């Protein structure tokens, strides 16, 4: 691995770890430590976690922090295809280790909560606690319905990321772009979070989900108690949604801007 790519991977690892540390940490505070957060507060914390992670690591790697974003930028924004797999591996590892760190810090609180409420890990009753680390759909949603939600919200996310980072589209956002992306994520979370937990990011979901699998929740962490394992949805739907969103932005907006020059 050359020095430049190594720095890129460090940036993606650390940036993804930061956003998971803040996001999963706030959910842990809500679920097991008695914090009084509502949907909007949680959405804001996730969004600001993303913004801070981008500010911290954009100079190293561009701060994709999301395999769906990396793949969409490869297909539609000239990102080097040789970096796609290393970026995704770094993002997954960062998310996994951040989830492990949050659990290590909250471990005794988890154990006390389970003891008081007579919860056994790996049983259906423990699914809510597994949801500290990753996302699961509202019980009323089918797998197909959850897939549609994740596809749509990730398409919107990706299209607006491209709009907010395209200096040819209106006033250049410059240093404000990460903050605006964080606000975008918070707004999506506030609007659609109750449906699927607004994963929109395979690394954000699978890295912590796999940690929960190893930490005692077992297959329940991966399946979500569904016949079709739920982990497939936030792995696949965000990638397809990001591709659709990037394509739509390029076709409907980016390609019609007077200063759009395409990839060089």
Curated annotation (Swiss-Prot):
First-listed, main subcellular location of the protein, grouped into a coarse class: membrane
GO molecular function: glycerol channel activity
Function of the molecule: Mediates glycerol diffusion across the cytoplasmic membrane via a pore-type mechanism.
Record text about domains: Aquaporins contain two tandem repeats each containing three membrane-spanning domains and a pore-forming loop with the signature motif Asn-Pro-Ala (NPA).
PANTHER family assigned to the protein according to its UniProt record, in alphabetical order: AQUAPORIN OR AQUAGLYCEROPORIN RELATED, AQUAPORIN-9
Annotated family: Belongs to the MIP/aquaporin (TC 1.A.8) family.
Name of the protein in question: Glycerol uptake facilitator protein
Gene: glpF
